[in-house]
Amino acid sequence: NVSPNIFFEDTSSEENIKRLPILGKIAAGIPILAQENIEGYLPYDDNDADFCLRIHGDSMINARINDGDIVFIKQQSTVENGEIAAVLVNDSATLKRVYFVDDTVQLRSENPKYKPMVFSKNNCDNFRILGKAIALYTKF
């Protein structure tokens, strides 16, 4: 016999939980975690994530990432082919699948109504990878 209280006990350790900043918009030239970019904080108990990005729009709906969702990002400057990443394009952050095709980098949406953004590997001044998407927070 098991007490029903086992389902309601908090077994997490406070020391493993960190508060991750939620970024609504990221401006070019400003450090990612600059105070003006932060719209709040979200507790998270996985040490891999460094910040969160609030999603605006429907470009990733086929990956089940919807408008208003929050994506947890591990800050890193590279990703593997086909991974979902937070990318700074010109002066705004976006979430896309990153593909390396021949001498190009393609940022693809998960919604067929959006065309891929294509950049030459030799001229990547217009974008940079901010980090890899590792988790999703969504409301029903």
Model-derived features with residue positions:
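Well-ordered beta-strand positions enriched in small/hydrophobic/aromatic, beta-favoring residues
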Residues: 53, 85-87, 107
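Short proline/glycine-enriched turn/loop segments at secondary-structure junctions
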Residues: 118-125
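Hydrophobic beta-strand signal
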Residues: 71-73, 86
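Short, Lys/Arg- and Gly-enriched loop/turn segments at beta-strand edges
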Residues: 78-86, 94-95
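PDZ-domain C-terminal substructure recognizer with occasional recognition of PDZ-binding tails
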Residues: 96-118
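Short, positionally conserved secondary-structure boundary motifs
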Residues: 1-66, 81, 92-93, 100-104, ...
